């Protein structure tokens, strides 16, 4: 008798997804490479049960956001653009000022650009926790240290 092989595609259901917590130390890491690794974990693409239309990702805590590494002349040349939708409401801020004022925002903007820009992407983004210093208040979730390759 021959074996029966199931050719059905597996689709994860929101209730059966198990979520883990990861902590990443951003000190000295290159911004774009770190952001792409974080986006992969948030999306759940590292899991075999990844389903594109279901939130299968894990939580990510990023510490030492103020000590992120950058390549080239990005510290002086990279700018962030925003507009308030009012006439003359353009706000342009360079990376050096943003790292000084709110270093968490730099990593958040980099990761947000790598997530889908829809309802699912907004739900995924809520699972990202970024802190400027080495401390974070999520010790009770017992996060696992995540190694990011340089």
UniProtKB/Swiss-Prot annotation:
Molecular function in Gene Ontology: mRNA binding; structural constituent of ribosome
Species of the source: Chlorobium phaeobacteroides (strain BS1)
Name of the protein in question: Large ribosomal subunit protein uL13
The keyword GTP-binding is assigned to this record: no
Quaternary structure annotation from Swiss-Prot or TrEMBL: Part of the 50S ribosomal subunit.
Keywords associated with the record: Ribonucleoprotein, Ribosomal protein
Domain of life of the organism encoding this protein: Bacteria
InterPro entries, alphabetized: Ribosomal_uL13, Ribosomal_uL13_bac-type, Ribosomal_uL13_sf
One GO BP annotation of this record: translation
NCBIfam families named in the record: rplM_bact
Role of this protein: This protein is one of the early assembly proteins of the 50S ribosomal subunit, although it is not seen to bind rRNA by itself. It is important during the early stages of 50S assembly.
GO cellular component, one term: cytosolic large ribosomal subunit
Family: Belongs to the universal ribosomal protein uL13 family.
PANTHER family in the record: LARGE RIBOSOMAL SUBUNIT PROTEIN UL13M (PTHR11545:SF2), RIBOSOMAL PROTEIN L13 (PTHR11545)
């Amino acid at each position: 008798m021959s074996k029966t092989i199931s050719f059905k595609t597996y689709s994860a259901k929101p209730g059966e997804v198990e979520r883990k917590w990861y902590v990443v130390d951003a000190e000295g890491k290159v911004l774009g490479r770190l952001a792409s690794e974080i986006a992969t974990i948030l999306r759940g693409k590292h899991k075999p049960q990844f389903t594109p239309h279901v939130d299968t990702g894990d939580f990510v805590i990023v510490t030492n956001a103020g000590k992120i590494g950058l390549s080239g002349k990005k510290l002086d040349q990279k700018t962030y653009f925003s507009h308030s939708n009012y006439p003359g409401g353009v706000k342009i801020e360079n990376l050096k000022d943003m790292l000084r004022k709110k270093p968490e925002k730099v990593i958040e903007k980099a990761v947000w650009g790598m997530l889908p820009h829809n309802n699912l992407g907004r739900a995924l983004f809520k699972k990202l926790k970024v802190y400027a210093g080495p401390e974070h208040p999520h010790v009770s979730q017992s996060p696992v240290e995540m190694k990011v390759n340089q």
